[in-house]
Amino acid sequence: MNFVVLTLFPLMFPAFAGHGIVRRAVEQGLVDIEALNIRDFAEGRHSTTDDRPYGGGNGMVLKPEPLAKAIRAAKEVHTDARVVFLGPRGRLFDQETAARLAGGKDIIMVCGRYEGIDERIAATLIDEEISIGDYILSGGETAAMVVMDAIIRLIPGALGNESSAEQESFSNQLLEHSHFTRPPVFEGMETPEILLSGDHGKIDQWRTRASLLYTLANRPDLLEGREFSKEEITILENWGRQIADIIRTQGLHGPDALSRNR
């Protein structure tokens, strides 16, 4: 898969492409990452890439001419590429979107700066706008790296161990379980005995319960519309009975009953 990043700061990307899983994917020929400087497509002595917005207001807007030329130049080489703009109005990026893009065509990523891009570019040359969250960044470069990293991890061969991607958070709409490594006891805190038992069936059950618990506590929205396995349904039903018992105890003895009985 080829990524072409259109940016005013191309020197940000060699470091991204030169480390970890991304570097390995590049070296194996699984992906190629090219950063094009939008300024190289600007005209005039100063190669101006931004201007004041019509109608007034704060900030500057990326000019349409250099951005259009940059996109078209990238499309000449990667004719079937999908043009993705990293911007705040876009669809919220998630694992499902990463998987969809990983199974698709090459991607041209447009990194916004200032107040954004001219709407005429968005309306005619952008295939999809993506946001990585409800917060403000200085530009689309870091967002582009987030999106590329998530996509590259899903390309076959990038991780080395294909099961790694399947077991990570969000891959099955659950947050990942807790992890422990040596030593078994650290500053008085012990590793759960079951993880040291060697019983892989019980370990899998423990991990399933932990994933469900973390998801229910921190991201219950991920569970909406999810198809649960029989094992997961049993776990949730058991929790439901335990919660009902707690509620009955409080109803009989008052809200302080639990603290008094400890």
Swiss-Prot record:
Q: Which InterPro entries match?
A: Alpha/beta_knot_MTases, tRNA_m1G_MeTrfase_C_sf, tRNA_m1G_MeTrfase_TrmD, tRNA_m1G_MTases_N, tRNA_MeTrfase_TRMD/TRM10
Spell out the NCBIfam families in the cross-references. Answer: PRK00026.1, trmD
Subunit record text:
Homodimer.
Binding-site list for S-adenosyl-L-methionine: 112, 132-137
Protein name per the record: tRNA (guanine-N(1)-)-methyltransferase
Q: Name one GO biological process term.
A: tRNA N1-guanine methylation
Per its UniProt entry, what is the enzyme's top EC class, as one word?
transferase
Name the chemical reaction catalysed here.
guanosine(37) in tRNA + S-adenosyl-L-methionine = N(1)-methylguanosine(37) in tRNA + S-adenosyl-L-homocysteine + H(+)
This protein's UniProt keywords: Cytoplasm, Methyltransferase, S-adenosyl-L-methionine, Transferase, tRNA processing
Q: Name one GO cellular component term.
A: cytosol
Localization terms from the record: Cytoplasm
Query: What does this protein do, in the record's words?
Result: Specifically methylates guanosine-37 in various tRNAs.
Task: Specify whether Kinase is a keyword of the entry.
Answer: no
EC number(s) from the headed UniProt entry: 2.1.1.228
Q: Name one GO molecular function term.
A: tRNA (guanine(37)-N1)-methyltransferase activity
The entry's family comment says: Belongs to the RNA methyltransferase TrmD family.
Top-level lineage group: Bacteria
